[in-house]
From Swiss-Prot:
A GO cellular-component term linked to this record: cytoplasm
Protein name: Cell division protein SepF
Keywords from the UniProt entry: Cell cycle, Cell division, Cytoplasm, Septation
Localization per Swiss-Prot or TrEMBL: Cytoplasm
Major localisation: cytoplasm
GO biological process, one term: FtsZ-dependent cytokinesis
Subunit and partners: Homodimer. Interacts with FtsZ.
InterPro entries from the UniProt entry: Cell_div_SepF (IPR023052), Cell_div_SepF/SepF-rel (IPR007561), SepF-like_sf (IPR038594)
Family: Belongs to the SepF family.
Function: Cell division protein that is part of the divisome complex and is recruited early to the Z-ring. Probably stimulates Z-ring formation, perhaps through the cross-linking of FtsZ protofilaments. Its function overlaps with FtsA.
Length: 151
């Protein structure tokens, strides 16, 4: 390093350097920052349209077998937390099963979700972020719900 460069550096550190040189330096930085901001703005629009599969949250399905009417509130809580619930009422009494299905189907409707009978005494309740494909409605018309059958 030459003596002139060393002297200029010391003068610059002390604040006695030529102001024109500093102004040019800061103007260049400001121009670069503006360009960066414009680039960021266009990048966000492109990024909003692309969804990576790996960033999607995995949905967990909850399986419950309620033994009392009070268990229906925990089923509704799972739906409120946007989790699908499979409810097994095969071993429940008919009146209890009907009350639970009435309560949970009302909660599902209020949350904008759907329900579907999967099997005899087994129901699928899903929140509004989950779609059910495949319908079994014709089976309901022919066979009815399990609590309406006489044994």
């Amino acid at each position: 390093m030459t003596m002139a460069k060393l002297f200029d550096k010391v003068i610059g550190i002390m604040g006695f350097a030529d102001d024109d040189y500093e102004d040019d330096y800061f103007e260049e930085e400001e121009e670069k920052e503006e360009v960066r901001e414009e680039t960021r703005g266009t990048g966000n629009r492109k990024g909003a349209q692309v969804v990576s599969i790996h960033t999607q949250k995995q949905i967990k399905v909850v399986v419950m077998e309620p033994q009392a009417f009070e268990d229906s509130q925990s089923i509704a809580d799972q739906l409120r937390n946007r989790r699908p619930v499979i409810v097994n009422l095969e071993n429940a009494e008919r009146n209890l099963a009907k009350r639970i299905v009435d309560f949970v189907s009302g909660a599902t409707y209020a949350l904008g979700g759907n329900m579907q009978k999967v099997g005899n005494g087994i129901f699928l309740f899903v929140p509004n972020n989950v779609d059910i494909s495949g319908e079994m409605k014709d089976d309901f018309k022919e066979k009815g719900f399990f609590w309406s059958l006489t044994k």
